[in-house]
Amino acid sequence: MVSIYAFIYFIHNISQSIQISNILQNIFETAKSRLTKLIDTEEKQKSDFPETEDWKEYHSEKSGYLQNISFTNLVDICESEDIKLHILPVKGIFVLSGIPLFRCNKDLDEDKVKKILSNFNFSREELVADNYTLAFKQITEIIVKAMSPGINDPGTAINGIDYLTELLALRMKKKDQSMILRDEVAYIKLNTIDFEDLLYNIMAPIRTYCKNDIILVQKLLLMFYYLEKQESDNTNYCKYLRKEAESLMKDAKASIENEEDIEKATELAARFNLHTTKD
């Protein structure tokens, strides 16, 4: 009887692992497709955009996740009215009614504002296809849940780190801002989440739940080492990687008691040229 229960438990765990693996794979593929498309679009952008701090702000009249923006229509409006727009919320995030939605380099009457606002579509549901940063959030949540005390599944956490590594390497090819052009003229500027903020939002919860596990600490250090060697659009990206790697080592050394484990982590950190001590 005991062997039957053990077999059922084994089958349940295997099925659950396969299900989580499929979820991770689907999240990864959707985000990879979205990121690749954004990067390909950016490679064609060679125009500058003026500073917008002094432009007039116009506010959202709806609440919801900013999912779809009709850029073709907005560029048509920009051309016909001889204006430029700076869209303030990051596409895919939740927007509250009344917050600044866009800036314009000219004052707009009520009809023109409503015409522009009609090209912003909101939803009550988040989608990775519209917001690639949601994929980082979801994979991070899977890693954190896998390493929570009640579950303790380092295998799933390691798989999640592998997917994060590949997506971060792809994100490093992307600029921290995007523009919409027509005939090599930039009409619309889009805000995107900075790589530094994205990396911190990923690593802060992961450090909390993984700092006690030497295997996962090593895995994360190898992730940083790999990412530092990747092609990057911004030289500061490597500085942000180093900063997060240093924070990881600091937390790990404060949490791991085994001196041999600390020695192994320190050796890996040395490969990453981190200035760490064994105490």
Task: Give the predicted meaning of each segment.
Residues 1-279:
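Well-ordered secondary-structure scaffolds
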